């Protein structure tokens, strides 16, 4: 989709500056004056040739079941609240999900599983996320990807992750004043986030806990008077994980209820939108497949 051609919520225009390599990504991310301009610049990035080729090939050929649809076929910027309490970090858009719809975790089964949980936990207006412009709204939450473009086989390279990182650094820095909890969906996002947090000005713990479902630690903003931010690990809601039972609805709900409660995201969200908060609980540590703590009553 060319920028400025009427796609819902597309903030880019034909005049939006385009990054064609890592140095330009760093420059354009760091110099974006507002979150809106950062979003626009992310959405037209062409810094990684392999990812550009793949996302555009998928958008041109299209899956048979989506032949009649127009694909977004561009990088997927972050979306959600402008001043979120909860930041949700995923891996990358799906080729026929976000790359088609223009919004991460939208239009695929992983998104169906994720948004059902976000709705139950009061962090989304609807239990489904179909396409941009469907009325879905995140409540006191924002969603981003460690890599903004759909990668072949859902596996971005280390160089692609590192090239994309300045976009995430800039976005984290812009929303940092309001964020109180960060949920990492999967080990890739967990590992990618540590250098991003440091670059965005956070003080990290001396020992990084290993990734696991329910793993948690606190990071601190550079301002000593600012409250800590809770970092939570969560198994990715991929079909492989959800179909095999490695991650269940209760497991996802436990993580998001913990994030919502710690961050205070439910205090002014306009209602819970589903299951009341406090119905699931996590203790500090790594999830082994069973809930590690009793329900918080």
Where are these regions (language model features)?
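Short polybasic linear motifs
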Residues: 270
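Short, intrinsically disordered C-terminal tails of secreted or membrane-associated proteins
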Residues: 292-294
